[in-house]
Amino acid sequence: MLSSGRESNYYLDGRVITLTPEGAYLVAAIILDMIKDEALDAVGGPTLGADPIAGALAALSYVNKCPVKTFIVRKQAKEHGTQRQVEGPALKKGSRVVLVDDVATSGKAIMEAKLALDKIGVIADKAIVIVDRSEGAVDNLAKVGLKLESIFKLADFGL
């Protein structure tokens, strides 16, 4: 069962890649190259898929002397502490961000993250995933103003 609610004969777990030293480095390096010409304030996305990607992006961008702030979007705001739904360095109203996630099927998690950002006045118009399963995410995200880019498409794996 996928997070989108759909059933599938295969499950792509991006954390198997992003929680290894080599995988985290490679994903971060590729995404940094994909966003190098973007005028943006931060990169982040829905927990849990975006968590290791955001951490790797922050670290590698710092090492490369082009630091990028990162953030994580919770499914719901915390009921204690800061009571925020968007965690990380404070994003100001009007900030422009790029969303990231490990896998996109329908795009639901990315859309929910965008809605949370919309509520605080943060602008997201692009999302990058490691794998696009090619099951509707491109069209669904376009409906909410997000352009989806991916490192891989499902067809790249012969699936």
Question: Which residue ranges define each predicted feature?
Answer:
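Short Gly/Pro-enriched loop/turn and capping motifs at secondary-structure junctions
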Residues: 78, 103-106, 131-136
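PRPP-dependent phosphoribosyltransferase catalytic core
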Residues: 115-159
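Short glycine-rich phosphate-binding loop at a beta-alpha junction
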Residues: 39-49, 128-129
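Active-site-facing substrate-recognition patch
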Residues: 1-39
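Short, glycine/charge-rich flexible loops or terminal/linker lids adjacent to PRPP-binding catalytic cores
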Residues: 55-98, 106-112
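Short acidic, glycine/proline-enriched helix-loop-strand junctions
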Residues: 37, 53-68, 139-154, 158
